[in-house]
Design a protein with these regions (language model features):
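A short N-terminal beta-strand-loop micro-motif at the entrance of redox/enzyme domains
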Residues: 13-29
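Short, electropositive alpha-helical surface patch
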Residues: 128-142
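Structural motif
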Residues: 73-75, 118, 140-142
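C-terminal helix-cap and adjacent tail motif
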Residues: 3-14, 18, 143-172
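Small-aliphatic-rich amphipathic alpha-helix that forms the alpha element of a beta-alpha
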Residues: 34, 76, 91-132
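Residue-level "edge-of-site" marker
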Residues: 47, 124-126, 143
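Short secondary-structure boundary segments
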Residues: 80, 123-124, 149
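Glycine/small-residue-rich phosphate/adenosyl-binding loop
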Residues: 26-28, 32, 36-103
Length: 172
């Protein structure tokens, strides 16, 4: 298996973390992977908040009140600039969410390479999150992920994936 496929297979949604903060060097490499992520017309309509402050972490955890989230020593919150989205002319569809998703997955894969766990979270109170981060109107929270070393309770549940013939249509 290639290194990349192995990395893709390693990445999992982690819902239990050790209290130890990731190293500064590991976070720097994760941040660099995010910085290198592509976006439509290279607009890069994003900003990422890396949060380790206990008070702010507690407030952000209240926007997605799940007990497991409070085990994370740090969070990344990904926000998009709605004024900087590339918009497809054919149907006026803004691509900020897509661009941000690409960057967040870069984050998750880079974290996995560092031995860190992450978990995509999109079902949170974005208005409360925006208030915690003191965002102006042009910035909108899209996703957040805890980041840290997987805890003892973390178990890879054996992700089930659809077979290739249900995913791909080859037109040859």
């Amino acid at each position: 298996m290639s290194n990349f496929l192995s990395l893709c297979n390693t990445r999992a949604s982690v819902r239990d973390y050790l209290p130890t903060l990731p190293t500064t060097e590991a976070i720097a490499r994760v941040k660099e992977a995010v910085r290198l992520a592509p976006s439509a017309c290279n607009k890069q309509p994003w900003r990422f908040f890396y949060v380790t402050n206990p008070e702010i972490l507690a407030q952000l955890c209240q926007t997605y009140p799940r007990p497991w989230l409070t085990t994370a020593p740090a969070l990344f919150v990904a926000v998009k600039n709605v004024a900087e989205n590339w918009v497809r002319p054919a149907d006026n569809h803004a691509h900020g969410d897509i661009d941000l998703a690409i960057a967040v997955e870069h984050l998750c894969l880079a974290a996995a390479e560092e031995g860190l766990g992450t978990c995509w979270i999109c079902n949170f109170d974005i208005e409360a999150c925006a208030a915690v981060l003191e965002l102006s109107e042009e910035w909108q929270p899209v996703a957040m992920t805890p980041i840290g070393y997987p805890g003892e309770k973390h178990q890879d549940a054996g992700r089930k994936r659809k077979p290739a013939d249900e995913v791909f249509v080859d037109l040859v």
